Amino acid sequence: HYSSRRQRQMCIRDRSLLRETACNQMKSFIQEIPNGIYESSAWIDSDGVINEPLEIKLAITKKDEELEFDFSGSSKPCKGPMNSVLATTLSSVYLAMRHIFPEVPINGGAFIPLKVKRPFNTFLDAHYPRPVSGCAAEVSQRIAEAVFIALVEVLPSRVTAAPAGTSGNFALGGFNEDTNSDFVMYQLSGGGYGGNSDHDGLANGCSTIGISKAPPVEIMEQKFPVLYHHYALHDGSGGAGKQRGGFGLDYKLEILCENAQASFVMDHGRYGPQGAMGGLDGEVNVVNVQQSNKVYTPIHLSKEQDIQLTKGDTVHVKTPGGGGYG
């Protein structure tokens, strides 16, 4: 019993030490930033219901060893699924700071010096029954973009221009006559990363909130009734600059079953990822659906539900390039 109690005490002590170490490291990095207020804005294309952009307005106040993140003035709660719960808003800020200061260990102590002012009455503090299915994959990345753009000028060697900032969610469902069964295909897509002070942005990188991308097209074609016409880089999509943004992804697939439905939850279809330090914005996300003899572009550009497809129709997606730097 004494041994077990002693081990528990040591674990508690070690956990406290790890948290304290991470907290102190984050504080030391924050001191690289001069005291002051740093502002930015980032935009969601629309909420998928009302075709108007949503603004994320951010003011970061640096005072000594702390940063305060204030999203007051951001757009009001929306009707569509692009609201963010508070937990996602907080974690998106923490994620962005982890990208900026990757040396700091990941534990709760690292976030103690990061104070997020609760964004009451905005779409970044959603409450039931507001729909929130787009917050984790899409809104989170735009929050991170706002943090990057606010701090890039004061931390030019640590912060990049904005990355593609979308998970490229594409769902296709229907009935596969070859297997005599229903199917649902889900594809996540990469995009270009922002350029930085040292080099061009990464081409077709994973989304900034995860490490998932689509399986090889050969596997997708084996499992689902689709044929990829091409799967390549979105040539020239990176924003121009001293260090250009990385290229996004360009893919086109054909429907091989009799009927299917396509849905998209993406972003950056209206505004490209922001450039930094004078660099230009990256190219926007583009979705085109070829239905028989007509080309359909979603009303909300990057968001649409249950587009009806028949055999021979095609889906063509170009994901955003990263912003240019300098």
Kindly give the residue locations of the regions a language model identified.
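Single conserved hydrophobic/aromatic residue that forms the stacking wall/gate
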Residues: H1-I12
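Amphipathic alpha-helical
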Residues: R13-I37
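Flexible, glycine/threonine-enriched loop-and-boundary segments that flank and lead into catalytic domains
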Residues: G36-A59, L233-G236, Y296-H300
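Short beta-strand elements
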Residues: L54-G73, G174-N176, S181-G190
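Helix-loop-helix junctions within predominantly alpha-helical proteins
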Residues: K27, S84-T88, S92, H99-S292, ...
